[in-house]
Amino acid sequence: MLKSNLKIDNSFSVMGVVSRLPKRLKSPSGIEHCKFLLEHRSDQIESGFTRQAWLKMPVQISGNQLIEKTQSITVGSKILVVGFITSHKTQSGLCQLVLHAEQIEFID
């Protein structure tokens, strides 16, 4: 339960399995980026009923601090990602939510 004085602006955390090979790039300004697809599946209780929650979400990791952690990310890695979500426009012009990682933890 959130307290009324608690300010949460844009925070998102999800645990899942990497389902697409990470793609690493470097921007013209020299910032390193790593992008991959994370798949999440879980059972959630909603209005007293169990429902399956499922999503595939693109994750983007930027900057030297987290990039080193991405070297061991492979398809099938189970990870927890904490960050913020924003909208990116795809090549086909559609808007897609992307999770920008601020923390990554490997789950055994």
UniProtKB/Swiss-Prot annotation:
GO terms for cellular component: primosome complex. InterPro entries: NA-bd_OB-fold, Primosome_PriB/ssb, Prisomal_replication_PriB. SUPFAM superfamilies: Nucleic acid-binding proteins (SSF50249). It comes from the Bacteria. Residues 8-108 form the SSB domain. Coiled coil: none annotated. Gene3D superfamilies: Nucleic acid-binding proteins. GO terms for biological process: DNA replication, synthesis of primer. Keywords: DNA replication, DNA-binding, Primosome. It holds the Pfam family SSB_1. Involved in the restart of stalled replication forks, which reloads the replicative helicase on sites other than the origin of replication; the PriA-PriB pathway is the major replication restart pathway. During primosome assembly it facilitates complex formation between PriA and DnaT on DNA; stabilizes PriA on DNA. Stimulates the DNA unwinding activity of PriA helicase. HAMAP family: PriB. Homodimer. Interacts with PriA and DnaT. Component of the replication restart primosome. Primosome assembly occurs via a 'hand-off' mechanism. PriA binds to replication forks, subsequently PriB then DnaT bind; DnaT then displaces ssDNA to generate the helicase loading substrate. This is Replication restart protein PriB. It comes from Haemophilus influenzae (strain ATCC 51907 / DSM 11121 / KW20 / Rd).
